[in-house]
UniProtKB/Swiss-Prot annotation:
Catalyzes the GTP-dependent ribosomal translocation step during translation elongation. During this step, the ribosome changes from the pre-translocational (PRE) to the post-translocational (POST) state as the newly formed A-site-bound peptidyl-tRNA and P-site-bound deacylated tRNA move to the P and E sites, respectively. Catalyzes the coordinated movement of the two tRNA molecules, the mRNA and conformational changes in the ribosome. This is Elongation factor 2. InterPro entries: EF-G-like_DII, EFG_II, EFG_III/V, EFG_V-like, G_TR_CS, P-loop_NTPase, Ribosomal_Su5_D2-typ_SF, Ribsml_uS5_D2-typ_fold_subgr. One of its GO terms (molecular function) is GTP binding. NCBIfam families: aEF-2, small_GTP. The modification Diphthamide is found at residue 603. SMART domains: EFG_C, EFG_IV. The keyword Ligase does not apply. Belongs to the TRAFAC class translation factor GTPase superfamily. Classic translation factor GTPase family. EF-G/EF-2 subfamily. GTP binds at residues 28-35, 94-98, 148-151. It is found in: Cytoplasm. Keywords: Cytoplasm, Elongation factor, GTP-binding, Nucleotide-binding, Protein biosynthesis.
């Protein structure tokens, strides 16, 4: 039996012993060394050859990733590691750190119970470190810390042992500050990264060594020895004495939870069903014999096998050939193949049980975030939808160069929409022009060049990038009448800004989009009141949609209940496009004050009620002082002090604001905020301004008001682009 075959046998046997499983991820800021770390862990566990690790980037198995040298999709792999005489199964996920691919990170977090947060010793805690940590803590994923590239502090920055420890303490303190701020209440203390107990490791993933306090005590290696090895260029000897995979995987096994421990507190966070029900108890116990419950965390498209769903099982078991039920798309599907991941390969296994991560083929209609259960015991409700902290802010129009490619292009676009829930796709079969909205320039580029061009073999024309704007209101409208086309139904309403605290709760995901059949359910009502909505209104919310809400303040109108669904539909259509530039509205509250309906139901059908409320909402919004909002990005620039002035000028020239500046040694760290509309071509410009000597990164930071002096111009440009008549 070869090494790989032995490994597969071990993996199969360990899959049934919960306390010996760890589902873990590796996440970090771009280029802080996640994939190099993952590869060396695989090499250490005997999955790829040691000589190739670090250069091989086994988890960057996509050609596009290898060419760019960054991880774009999250890759999965299973391996075995021995700790204190016992073997453990480790399911490892490597996630992208580039801000444009944050959606993949969000999805990976749902599958794992613990994460190794990688932080570069030279750059320290960066914006994306903060974002991935926030996502992890939101999904109740326990973190441990690996400070990477320590050799650079010694060889390039020539730090003394005291300075080294000072630098480490600063990074650990920053990470712990974030954990204290964002961790679930019950774990705020317990999850802090503590050096003494070994929840922090230091090392160099590229040179394949790492160290932690427990390992120092075990092996007798001191910080001084590390400095000597690095200075004398003997890091390969250090790698033999303190191998990276041993230190990191020991830390993971000792400090990260097994599925049985983790599911007790993770399930209530992601599933809002009855904890005392059979399936509720079974998920909390991670019971392989309970009802089936799992969640699809990622869709991978394979040229040969078609669509593969990566799935985390929380309860029950999936065997090859089982009939499954997809809760979101309300469809049945058959598990044609059940496999475990080994990097780019999949190895078939007869069945997979609760607590594991697997690869399923045959779920054609599944999307990322889909709930999987058995048709005989449908999981009600499904798992909470995966919320992602950024939003698509850039749109491009694409058309196929050859008309014969049109049907294939539409199929590929639908497939991309299923794979990646941070992409918004609008397909217009009449004009042949399709819109793709993504998180940033790179995200869009990968979709158009790689997924459509390279994988799909379709040549497309890509239009100029368009920024996604929003509209909101700053005042309260007078009472507005919305009339149906036949003039027999009248609805009276007022538009006013939603309370800031309520909108903030919506952005944080405490309140989400939903329609209420009769009245607000108790859970939503409590959350709305906590967020600051008046109790009287919280009881009467009809619908929350895209961060807008409609409240029924009428009394004793019988026909209103019959028309409820139509009113909600009309409200949604009304806020889809605001009055200024037909961009989506947000933060708008519509209060329904009164209504009169025709007594004959035939005269108050959809074709009458929907337009009445839709036009009413639009009129109310346009008379409530509407304004335009634009997407903003936080920007972090790390540059030598000599170029600080040029870097600041580059931000100021783009309508940006400097939020904070720090100096560390001869480097300056600049934090600012810049409108996305002004960020095109920034990469080249900042490289020129600092002669290529700066590190920079951006992160989406919400929508802000467009300055008054340019609002008219921007609105005119959008209306012109959309072919709306100029106001």
């Amino acid at each position: 039996m070869g090494r790989r075959a032995k490994m597969v046998e071990k993996v199969k046997s360990l899959m049934e012993t919960h306390d010996q499983i760890r589902n873990m991820g590796i996440c970090a800021h771009i280029d802080h060394g996640k994939t190099t770390l993952s590869d060396n862990l695989l090499a250490g566990a005997g999955m790829i050859s040691k000589d190739l690790a670090g250069d091989q980037l086994a988890l960057d198995f996509d050609e596009e990733e290898a060419a760019r040298g960054i991880t774009i999709y999250a890759a999965n792999v299973s391996m075995v590691h021995e700790y204190n005489g016992k073997e453990y199964l480790i399911n490892l996920i490597d996630t992208p750190g580039h801000v444009d691919f944050g959606g993949d990170v969000t999805r990976a977090m749902r599958a794992i119970d613990g994460a190794v947060v990688v932080c570069c010793a030279v750059e320290g805690v960066m914006p994306q470190t903060e974002t991935v940590l926030r996502q992890a803590l939101k999904e109740k994923v326990k973190p441990v810390l690996f400070i990477n590239k320590v050799d650079r502090l010694i060889n390039e920055l020539k730090l003394t042992p005291e300075e080294l420890q000072g630098r480490f303490m600063k990074i650990i303190a920053e990470v712990n500050k974030l954990i204290e701020k964002m961790a679930p209440e019950e774990f705020k203390k317990e999850w802090l990264c503590d050096v003494v107990t070994g929840k922090v490791a230091f090392g160099s993933a590229y040179n394949n060594w790492a160290i932690s306090v427990p390992y120092m005590q075990k092996s007798g290696i001191s910080f001084k020895d590390i400095i000597d090895y690095c200075e004398q260029e003997k890091q390969s000897e250090l790698a033999d004495k303190a191998p990276l995979h041993e230190v990191i995987l020991d830390m993971a096994i000792k400090h990260l939870p097994n599925p049985l421990q983790a599911q007790k507190y993770r399930i209530p966070n992601i599933w809002k069903g009855d904890a005392e029900s059979e399936v509720g108890k079974s998920m909390a116990m991670c019971d392989p014999n309970g009802p089936l419950a799992g969640v699809v965390t990622k869709i991978i498209v394979d040229k040969h096998a078609g669509s593969i769903s990566a799935c985390r099982l929380f309860s029950g078991r999936i065997k090859q050939g089982d009939e499954l039920y997809l809760v979101g798309s309300k469809q049945k599907a058959r598990a044609q193949q059940v496999a475990i991941f080994m990097g780019a390969e999949r190895v078939q296994v007869p069945s997979i049980s609760a607590g594991n991560i697997c690869a399923l083929t045959g779920l054609r209609e599944a999307t990322a975030g889909e709930t999987v259960c058995s048709p005989s015991k449908i999981l009600e409700p499904g798992f909470e939808s995966l919320t992602h902290t950024s939003e698509p802010v850039i749109t491009v129009a694409i058309e196929a160069k050859n008309t014969k490619d049109l049907p294939k292009l539409i199929e590929i676009l639908r497939q991309i929409g299923r794979e990646d829930n941070t992409v918004r796709i609008e397909i217009n079969e009449e004009t042949g022009e399709h819109l793709i909205s993504g998180m940033g320039e790179l995200h869009i580029e990968v979709i158009t060049n790689t997924k459509i061009g390279r994988d799909g073999g379709i040549e497309v024309d890509v239009g100029e990038p368009i920024i996604v704007y929003r509209e909101t209101i700053t005042g309260t409208s007078p009472e507005i009448e919305g009339k149906s086309p036949n003039k027999h139904n009248k609805l009276y309403m007022i538009a006013e800004p939603m309370e800031e605290s309520v909108y903030a709760a919506y952005v944080e995901g405490k309140i989400h989009d939903e329609d209420f059949k009769k009245k607000t359910n108790v859970d939503a009502e409590t959350r709305l009141i906590e967020a600051g909505l008046e109790r009287e209104q919280a009881k009467k919310v009809m619908s929350i949609y895209n961060g807008n809400m409609i409240v029924n303040m009428t009394k004793g109108i019988v026909q209103l209940d019959e028309a409820r669904e139509l009113i909600i539909e009309g409200f949604k259509e009304g806020v889809k496009g605001g009055p200024l530039a037909s961009e989506r509205a947000q933060g708008v509250k519509i209060k329904l004050i009164d209504a009169t309906f025709h007594e004959d139901a035939i005269h108050r059908g959809p074709s009458q009620i929907i337009p009445a409320i839709r036009f009413g909402v639009r009129d109310a919004v346009s008379s409530a002082k509407p304004i335009l909002l634009e997407p903003m990005q936080k920007i972090y620039i790390n540059t030598p002090q000599d170029y600080m002035g040029d870097a600041i000028r580059e931000i100021n020239n783009r309508r940006g604001q400097i939020v904070d500046m720090e100096q560390e040694g001869d480097m300056a760290i600049i934090k600012g905020s810049v409108p996305v509309a002004e960020m095109f071509g920034f990469a080249g410009a900042i490289r020129g301004a600092t002669q290529g000597r700066c590190l920079w990164s951006v992160e989406f930071s919400g929508f802000e008001r467009v300055p008054n002096e340019i609002q008219t111009k921007v609105v005119a440009q959008i209306r012109d682009r959309k072919g709306l008549k100029s106001e």
